[in-house]
Structure formats: C-alpha cells, structure tokens
Amino acid sequence: MLSQKKQDLTITIIDKTTHKVLPNAHVSIGRKHAYTNLNGNAIFHQIFNQISEEISEEKSPKKLLKITHVGYVNYQKIVDFSKKHTILLIALTQDNAILNEVTITQKPVKNFIKYSGNKQKINTEFLAQNRDNSLMQTLQNIPGVSAITIGSGQSKPTIRGLGFNRVVVVENGIKHEAQQWGADHGLEIDQYNVESIEITKGAASLMYGSDAIAGVINIKNNTLPNVNSLAGEVNITHKNNNNLYGISFGVKQRYKHWYYKTRITHQQYGDYKVPVRKITYDNYIFDLHQNNLRNTAGKNHNIGFSLGYTDDALSSTTYISNVHAKNGFFANAHGLEVRTSKIDYDKSSNDIDLPLHKVNHFKINNNTRFSLKNNTLDIEIGFQKNDREEHSEPIAHGYMSKPTSTMERRFTKNTYNFNIKNENYYFDNYKIVTGINLDYQHNKIAGWGFLIPEYTRFTVGAFVYNQLKINKNIHIDAGIRYDYGNLKTQAYYESFVSPVNKNGIISMQKLQRSTKNNLHFDNFSASAGISYSLKNTLYKINIGKSFRIPLANELASNGVNYHMYRYEQGKIDLKPESSYQIDAEFKADFSEFNNFKKASVQLTPFANYFDNYIYLTPTSGYYETLQKYKYTQNKVFRYGGEITLEYTPIKKIAFTASLEYVKSRQLNGEKKNFSLPFSPPLTGVFSFEYTFNDWVFFEKTKFFSNLRSTVNQHDIVPPEKPTNGATVINAGLHTNISVFSKKNPMKIQGKLNNIFNKTVFNHTSFYRLIEVPEPNRNFSISIIQTF
C-alpha cells in the first residue's frame, strides 16, 4: 500500500490571500483531469507509474499543469514530474486582486488570452462603483457598450451601435427571452443579483445561435460559497434626482456539498428631473412642472433563489427568479395630449399614472456539469414566462368605439430552453467543444390594440468548436454551426367592423390585420481566429459569419405603436440577416514589475458587412395622421473600434482614457448612403482615481471621477434628429468603515452625476425623438454592509 501511495500525486489548492482551501478547482496534467474535493485536494492515482513508462519510451517527464477556478486567475506551469513530489501546494490569486485596479477606474478588465474574439470580464467592484438606474446604464462606461434608455429605470444594451435582438443577454447559462424587439422594452434582470459579467463584442452566433450577431452580455451568479460558511449583504441606495429609495438583501450559505443563495430587491422612484422647463414635441410646447418629466415614476420588486450541489464529479445548480416592474411613460408623448386628459399628472411626482407598463418575468433553470475522465458535460434546461402589459387611456380610434379597459396590449411569452455542451481534453494541446441548443417560444397577445400577432418559434442549432495550442504563445480556434428555425404566426381580425369598398359595393367587415403563416429558416455560422501573446503584448484576429432569424414584428407587425408615434408594418418575405465580420485586438503592457502595471494600451478595431440588414424605414403613407413605417432589407457596411489607454504613475493614482467609434453606411435601397438608427456618436471617456492613506477609521478611501464627451451626431436616419455633442463630468468618493467588525467593514459611496447640471441629449435614448434631455444633476449614496 505504501509503495502504491508513493505513485499517487496530491495537489492542494488554496487561496493566496486567505489561505483557505479551494474545492471544485479544475486541475489538469497533460491529458489527465481532476477536480479538488472539499479539502482542496486533487488526487492523481498511479501517475508516477505512467510517467516512468513514458520516460522509458524516451518521452519527456515535463507536463503542463493547469488549474482553473471561478473567481481566480488561471494557473499554468511546466512541471518536471520525474522528481516525484507526491504533494504539491499551489496558491491561486483572486481575480479581484488583480482586476480591482482596473475596474474601479473604469478600465476594461483582463481579456481572455486563448480566445481569438474580443471578450471582457466585469466584476462586482466595477458594478458597485458604476451602479446606475439600470444594469445596462451601469455598463455603458465599457468602451463599445452603450444603452438605449427608457426613462430613468429601464434600458437595453447595444454593442457597437447594434441592439434589440442583435445582442444576446445570457443569465446563468440561459438566453434571456422577453419582448426585446420593442423600443420601449427594458431588461428584466436584478442588477444586484449579479456577480460577474462577460461581454463579447462581435459576432457570437457560433456559440449562442441566432440573435448574437452583434455580441453577448453573459451575466453570471455562479461563485461557490466557502465550505461551512454563512454570509450576507445589505445594500441601501438613495438618489435625489427622482427620489429613489432602494434596498437589496442577500444571503448565501454552504454546507459540505449543498449550498444556497437568495436575494430580495426593492426600488421605488418618482418622476425624474431634467434641466429644462419646456419640451417641444410634434409642434406642441409642454411645460414641465418643477422640471419633472411627468409620469416617469416606477417601482421594482425582485426575488432570486438558487440551490446547488457540488462534489468531485458533479456540480448542479437550480436558479429561480422573479422580476416585477411597473413604470410610467412620459404622458405628453403617447398619442394623447395631456390637456385632453382628466388625470392630474402634476399632483404628485411619485404617482404611476396612465400610460404605463407592467412586466413580470419568471425564470427557472438548472445547470448541471458532469466532470468525467477526459471531458466535461454541461446540461442546461430552463423555462421563462414574460408577462408584459401596456395600459393607456382608452379612446375611440376610427371605427373602434371607446374600449372599456385600459389594457392596450398584453404579451405573454413562454420560453423553453435546452442546451447541452461537451468539452473534450483527450490531447494536451487540443480542446474540442460540441453542443446543441434548442429553444421554443409561444407568444400570446391580448388587449384592444394590435401590433404583432400571436406566434410560436422553434430554433435548434448544433456546433463544433476547436481550440489548438501551437505553443505557449500561439493559440488557434475555429468552429462551425448549423441552425434551423420555424416561425408560425396566427391570423388576427379586428374586434370591430369597418366599411370595405369592393367593386363599388360597401360592406361592414372585421378587417384582417395578420395572416396565418408557417415560415422556415436555416443557415450556417462559422469563425476562425488566432491569438499570439508575448510577455507584454497580445495580438488577436478573428473572422466569422453570423446570422439572425427575422422576428415576428419584422415579418408580421401591422398596427399603431403609440410609444413611437407611428404605424408599423412588417414584411412576410424577409430573409435571415447574414453578417461577415473581422475583429482584431492589440494590447501592450509597459513597465511591468512586481505585478505593478504602469501603463498599457489596447486597440480593438472591427469591420462587418450585412448582405440583408433588416430595419424599419418611413414611407409616404399615413394611417389616421400617423406616418407608416415598413420593414425592409438592405446591404450595410460598418466599421469602427475602441482604444483604451491606462497610466498608473504611482499606486495611489490611476488614469484611463478611452475612445469608441462606429461608422455605418447603407449601400443600397431608399436610404442608400444613410447611417443606421441609434448609431452612437464618437465618444471619449477620461477617468481619474486617487487612493488616500487610511485615516482614523476610514479605510481604502478613493476619489474617482470621469469626464464623458461626445461629438456632434449628424449622421442620422430620419426621423432621427441630429444630436449636438456634450461633455459631462461625474465624481464620487468611496470609503470603508469598520462599524460592526474589522473583517466586514461598511462600504459607503457617494456619487454626483452631471456636476454642472448641463442640458445633454443622448442620441440613443428612447426619448430623444421627442426632445427630452438626460436627467439633471443627481447625487446618489449607497451603503453596503456584509456579514
């Protein structure tokens, strides 16, 4: 037995800072793999016998030892196993320990070196410091990422000027499915229930299928709690601009194998203020009472729970969440003048009056990983129910009498997701990933207003992805994917009759707004790239083809969209979008010593071509005084990129400067030589941070500020309006105070946005079309106490 044990190797993994053991770390020696147990040990049985045999066959005893763990920097080292050390102790560095300096100063965090695409990881430090009214507004300081804002509490992501269903949002492995096609739709995710985010800029259809044509926002809440631990957090927030009060309470506990996490969040806010007293829209001038953008108040109630099990061979977590929001829409821009309404909108700035929307998003999904000898198998299954209601004051339209209900539209969308992925490690320098994704959606409609029909959508895709390590500096990856989609739309008839003139004979009929259709789509996606890294420089290039299946609104919409004050009409014979893209990246670190990076530069250019880009274009037709818009397809060419400079002259001071640029051009059609809607202007962000010495009971005190500047955006698509450039300065102060314990200090942060109260228009805002500027000066304070 003793001699047998001498042939075994035990590798113990610990945290470099806390010296605690780390269970569930993935350890590989050549083609052999293992996971650390609850004691932080990974045991490789009889490994020295095998190495002795390889030595006798004149093979090298040196092997690549690789260790990965969620929340820690990857460890790689060539080890000579001929020395037969039966026990190895290895300490991993926390991701935050290296990334804190990056994220707190709004720098893009560490890129994924082996992957040839453009990925960035955002951690909790960045999220806490940049916390805004919504998750996507929190992320808009990342170069290349921006948000389409809907009032003060809702927003949706755009990546390099593309948004809606061209950006996939993934939460805990499952694609988030709601009514993201709508311009007035926000993202139903609790931003306090997020531990890290991976952002992929560029085509990602290979791994995620249709809709990932512009990129992916991958939201994760999967960090394992420490063994036999109980921890929690209370987060209290107040913002004075819209009188927001919020509280978020989270608890997590782990036993040996089982663990759970839970979080409850509540926010309530009033109408937000803008730095103007009048707004001009559609030839009307609207006075704003006390600078309040009337009826933009709202509230959110969110709850999340996860239950998990982990051991050496199996890891499984079930996530359950429910996000509920109720928000008002600016009352002067919903197709109904406020002066004709009996609602006293200015009575209180905290009321949520008509028009408004209510949305409830329920989600349950399970992620299970099987750790086998030479591969890992991941299975993800989920169900989502998105229930969205839009309410407005009922009035008669055309031949429709006044409705008895305020519910203008209701969309109830049920989505079923299934993903399976297998990663094989049969060879030292080669990894192959295969996977299948299935999604089924059923979207029901209700209400007296019609925009899109009821539909079902089924998609299935299969992919193969390969990573090859040529040497320690060069990595190559490539893959191919095939997708099939089926979309069925239902017929819809108006509930009232209208006169129809057919061959001179007038009859009263219920008009048909949509027909029954059964549509099929299929396409291939592919990508290939190379990553070349030296000591202080990194080079990447990736080429790929992506596609997107047309949505129900693009194919079959046929109704009035009062939020956008227009009539929208789909085109049933639209083809899938295809995009051909090339991405590159160059990164260099300068004067690096003792893990102190004094300066760095990162450049990420891109170019892509659409052979059939789908968009909504105005026509010369009208419906009840509303201009008609129709969906069409054109060829589009886009290019641009981001550049980021970082400079840390001393450890107390850090500077960051970034610049992002996107240029789009339609190559044919009625809008030839025009740009694309919601194209962001040239934007620069300059950030500064100073860290103070600890003083009395104030610890880790930091002053931070950023200057965000945009140039004029005159490259527009009517009915968009040109937007003048502007510069906004924000600043804040963060400190820790040991109130209850030294181990868990209270974190206090105050932040002042738009310090000089400037009137600024955001070109990608939902309210830009109606001349509504961004909020005026806002002071926010947050208090976080962990235990």
What are these regions (language model features)?
Residues 14, 26, 68-72, 83-128, ...:
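Short, acidic, small-residue-rich periplasmic hinge/interaction motif at the N-terminus
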Residues 235, 240, 349-367, 505-533, ...:
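Outer-membrane beta-barrel signature, preferentially recognizing the C-terminal barrel domain
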Residues 294-300, 313-373, 383-414, 443, ...:
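Flexible loop and strand-edge segments within Gram-negative outer membrane beta-barrel domains
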